[in-house]
């Protein structure tokens, strides 16, 4: 506001909106390239690059008690509008739960080393517990810990007692290489990580109850894994799946996996698939709209949920719990 040290901005949102935000103080007039505003509509790719350069200077809202570190390490704060869908489990952050085991996976095939977290929500009948593999595990283990929400929904009878395996991505470069349709990553997981996990805990190894879950590249990776190894992974939880890959800017109608489905890619076994995308993430929303009917043509059970939000972990956390409940409800 002129003549003061107060910054002011306003917008209008629907009452069902949920999203995260941060403050990025700047007095620079050239934070975004000129081409971002040359057309009638802002150029989203140019805007994206401008925001990414600004994020290291972001701060959380100092008056908002609900804050965390986003996927790129910058502070975020939460905003839930009055009619945003409930997120059961996340409202009980103090729910007691058992200890989380953290191990190191030293992969010969991938030639790297990373953390893996193992968490169980019950041990009365270990061989009957389903398994869920969560990609971007470092986020759900450290930035926005998922343990209390999983335990709270298990205690409430919404989720069965289960084993959760959270896999670190190491860094953004490794993530961008390993998660998008990378057979080497999934072969290493099956040949190296799962055999080691069997020496540490037990679960029901039927594919009908084994979930692979991920967001963005992780959502793409989850569906890729199940389509190619259905004998191991029978349930998919894909949130904001990056089905544009590998051509973000030039192929809004779909990337490699969509093209393969259109070309007749058939899975040997029927899968259970839970898709979710935000209506405020245009490209992601478009490609999820495109892949949904393709999966309906070939798969046993596909559920598609559209969220009034963007490419945002604050939205994903609710869908993660809802997706697990839906996938396991008819399988157990």
Task: Please annotate each region the language model reported.
Residues 1-332:
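Non-catalytic cap/lid and distal C-terminal segments of serine-dependent acyl enzymes
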């Amino acid at each position: 506001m002129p003549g003061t040290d107060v910054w002011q901005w306003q917008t209008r949102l629907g009452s069902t909106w949920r999203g995260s935000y941060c403050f990025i103080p700047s007095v620079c007039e050239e934070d975004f390239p000129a081409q971002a505003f040359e057309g009638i509509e802002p150029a989203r790719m140019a805007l994206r690059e401008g925001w990414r350069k600004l994020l290291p200077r972001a701060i959380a809202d100092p008056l908002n008690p609900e804050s965390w570190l986003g996927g790129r390490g910058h502070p975020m704060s939460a905003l839930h509008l009055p009619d945003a869908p409930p997120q059961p489990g996340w409202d009980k952050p103090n729910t007691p739960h058992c200890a989380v085991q953290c191990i190191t996976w030293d992969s010969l095939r991938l030639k790297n080393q990373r953390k893996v977290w193992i968490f169980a929500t019950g041990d009365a009948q270990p061989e009957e517990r389903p398994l869920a593999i969560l990609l971007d595990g470092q986020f759900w283990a450290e930035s926005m810990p998922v343990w209390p929400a999983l335990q709270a929904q298990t205690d409430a009878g919404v989720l069965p007692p289960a084993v959760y395996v959270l896999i670190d991505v190491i860094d953004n470069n490794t993530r961008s290489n390993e998660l998008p349709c990378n057979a080497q990553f999934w072969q290493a997981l099956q040949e190296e990580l799962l055999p080691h996990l069997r020496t540490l805990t037990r679960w029901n190894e039927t594919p009908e109850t084994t979930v692979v879950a991920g967001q963005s590249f992780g959502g793409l990776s989850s569906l890729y894994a199940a389509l190619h190894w259905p004998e191991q992974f029978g349930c998919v939880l894909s949130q904001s799946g990056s089905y544009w890959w590998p051509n973000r800017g030039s192929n809004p109608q779909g990337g490699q996996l969509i093209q393969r489905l259109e070309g007749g890619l058939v899975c040997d076994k029927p899968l259970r698939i839970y898709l979710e995308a935000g209506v405020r993430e245009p490209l992601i929303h478009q490609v999820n709209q495109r892949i949904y009917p393709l999966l309906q043509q070939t798969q046993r059970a596909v559920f598609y949920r559209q969220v009034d939000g963007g490419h945002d972990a604050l939205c994903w956390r609710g869908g993660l719990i809802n997706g697990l409940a839906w996938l396991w409800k008819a399988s157990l």
